[in-house]
Amino acid sequence: MALNIENIIAEIKEASILELNDLVKAIEEEFGVTAAAPVAAAGAAGGEEAAAKDSFDIELTAGGDKKVAVIKVVREITGEGLKEAKGLVDNAPSVLKEGVAAAEAEELKAKLEEAGATVTLK
């Protein structure tokens, strides 16, 4: 019996929500698994996780008054061209870089703030 993944996906796309719910329940029973995410474990470690966060997203929240200086720093950080960097500054808030190490994130935040931007680390 050969399974055609595309046919299975097409059938799932056409199924109603009730049918999909029944499918999930049947899979859970057949294979002894659960589709629920482990929410309780993540909630218990939430405070510790925030303190021990090791990667950050750098979000430009406002370009500030010195847009030219900010655009130069944004170009340096992102490697984008002038037009793209200007677009990021003009359309703030925008994420400039994702998954940056804590030390590098602080360094880049300081550079941007020195140029006149308002920055948030998330």
UniProtKB/Swiss-Prot annotation:
This is Large ribosomal subunit protein bL12. Homodimer. Part of the ribosomal stalk of the 50S ribosomal subunit. Forms a multimeric L10(L12)X complex, where L10 forms an elongated spine to which 2 to 4 L12 dimers bind in a sequential fashion. Binds GTP-bound translation factors. GO terms for molecular function: mRNA binding; structural constituent of ribosome. NCBIfam families: L12. HAMAP family: Ribosomal_bL12 (MF_00368). Belongs to the bacterial ribosomal protein bL12 family. The lineage of its organism: Bacteria, Bacillati, Bacillota, Bacilli, Lactobacillales. One of its GO terms (cellular component) is cytosolic large ribosomal subunit. One of its GO terms (biological process) is translation. Forms part of the ribosomal stalk which helps the ribosome interact with GTP-bound translation factors. Is thus essential for accurate translation.
